[in-house]
A protein has these predicted regions:
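A short acidic, often aromatic-flanked loop/helix-cap motif at beta-alpha or helix-coil junctions
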Residues: 24-29, 46-48, 126-129, 149, ...
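Short, well-ordered secondary-structure micro-motifs
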Residues: 31, 79, 105-106, 131-133, ...
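Structured adenosyl-cofactor binding patch, chiefly the S-adenosyl-L-methionine
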Residues: 109-112, 176-226
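Active-site/ligand-binding-proximal alpha/beta "capping" segment
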Residues: 141-190, 195
Length: 266
């Protein structure tokens, strides 16, 4: 209860309008999704265009790592990719506007706060975007079971784009043609494939292991991460909400003082 009350105090101190409602009303406004007695209505997630992401990455002082998703339609997979990518130090995500999960409440919930920190570029055409990234000096590496080189052997130096397809369809034929190289993750068990978010996490970890992780030993801290600004102006709040108290006496709906068009629950 103390953590729940602390959350309410922080919300009120930040100018959030707090409204106590019935459980039935909370279920209605959250669309019946699983929650812990509290929901927050926020503005939609901020995104930036691809040119801004490329320009921002050019000023980082280290080789940028971007992820691109091809046909990932499950918001839980998207949220898991964002969470792993942000935690392991990726610099941004390229997300198609079509044939892709969006930056929804479900994705934000699985991302567990990471969506607020990882820049996302929404693009109309993924393959044209990959060509634009190659023109900017990036190598495009696609994850595919039929890849001609393993993850352990592939060159992961320099600016990179890692492209992941869906677990059932993989990369589209056209996307494969726009990759500089196809890489596979060797598997030993009977299970023929990995979840898309898990495969992506393994690849991002391998890039990190060969780069910023290589000089870290014992309890040495990780180097700070610098990423492109998500907007040239002040960044609005992204979809998020949380409470660690599973059963407060009265459900609460919080509404921020910004234009709100998405509803989140946790």
């Amino acid at each position: 209860a103390s953590k729940f009350l602390q959350l309410l105090r922080e919300a009120k101190a930040s100018g959030v309008l707090v409204e106590e409602v019935t459980w039935a009303r909370l279920a209605q406004v959250t669309g019946g999704s699983v929650h812990q007695g509290i929901a927050l209505q926020t503005a939609a997630a901020d995104t930036l265009d691809l040119s801004a992401l490329i320009d921002g990455c050019s000023e980082l002082g280290e080789p940028p790592l971007l992820l691109a998703l091809d046909g990932i339609t499950d918001p839980h997979n998207l949220g898991a990719v964002v969470r792993s990518a942000e935690a392991m130090g990726a610099h941004g995500l390229v997300l198609p506007q079509r044939r892709s999960a969006g930056l929804t409440g479900s994705a934000a919930k699985v991302a567990a706060g990471a969506m607020e920190h990882l820049p996302v570029a929404r693009v109309v055409n993924l393959n044209r975007s990959l060509e634009k990234l190659k023109d900017a000096g990036y190598r495009v590496i696609g994850l595919a079971a039929e890849g001609d080189v393993t993850l352990m052997d592939v060159d992961l130096e320099g600016p990179l784009v890692l492209v992941t397809g869906s677990e059932d369809q993989g990369l589209s034929v056209l996307t494969r043609r726009h990759c500089d190289q196809l890489v596979r993750i060797p598997l030993r068990g009977i299970t023929p494939s990995l979840n898309a978010s898990v495969a992506t996490a393994l690849c991002v970890y391998e890039v990190a292991r060969r780069n910023w992780m290589k000089d870290i030993h014992g309890q040495a801290p990780s180097p700070p991460i610098v990423r492109p600004q998500m907007k040239t102006q002040e960044v609005s709040s992204l979809p998020s909400a949380a409470s660690e108290n599973p059963q407060p006496e009265q459900p609460v709906v919080g509404q921020s003082d910004i234009d709100s068009n998405s509803l989140e629950s946790d």
